[in-house]
From Swiss-Prot:
InterPro entries: Insulin, Insulin-like, Insulin-like_sf, Insulin_CS, Insulin_family. The lineage of its organism: Eukaryota, Metazoa, Chordata, Craniata, Vertebrata. It comes from Danio rerio. PANTHER family: INSULIN (PTHR11454:SF9), INSULIN/INSULIN GROWTH FACTOR (PTHR11454). Keywords: Carbohydrate metabolism, Cleavage on pair of basic residues, Disulfide bond, Glucose metabolism, Hormone, Secreted, Signal. Residues 54-84 form a propeptide. This is Insulin. Insulin decreases blood glucose concentration. It increases cell permeability to monosaccharides, amino acids and fatty acids. It accelerates glycolysis, the pentose phosphate cycle, and glycogen synthesis in liver. PROSITE patterns: INSULIN. It comes from the Eukaryota. Heterodimer of a B chain and an A chain linked by two disulfide bonds. One of its GO terms (biological process) is type B pancreatic cell differentiation. Residues 1-21 form the signal peptide. Disulfide bonds join 30-94, 42-107, 93-98.
Length: 108
């Protein structure tokens, strides 16, 4: 009788814990966990990934700018660059928790 009581309590505990982990529950996903989650959510359609590349070799093709031109150019795009940085998937899902629904925004 005690075994059935323990088994019943364990079953109730499993049901309650599985209900609380629904797909909409936000989670922190970083590194390989984030990539695995994207593969799982996006499936065969894949997901958008744009790795950063080194732009130093490309800068040699441009004429040098004066200090004043550089300052004006940096100021003009500062807000836009800040917005892009804040909306990245790492900011959205690693630094803060995100849900499966938010991950779907990065699918192709």
């Amino acid at each position: 009788m005690a075994v059935w009581l323990q088994a019943g309590a364990l079953l109730v505990l499993l049901v309650v814990s599985s209900v609380s982990t629904n797909p909409g529950t936000p989670q922190h996903l970083c590194g390989s966990h984030l990539v695995d989650a994207l593969y799982l959510v996006c499936g065969p359609t894949g997901f958008f990934y744009n790795p950063k590349r080194d732009v130093e070799p490309l800068l040699g093709f441009l004429p040098p700018k004066s200090a004043q031109e550089t300052e004006v150019a940096d100021f003009a795009f500062k807000d836009h660059a800040e917005l892009i940085r804040k909306r990245g998937i790492v900011e959205q899902c690693c630094h803060k928790p995100c849900s499966i629904f938010e991950l779907q925004n990065y699918c192709n």
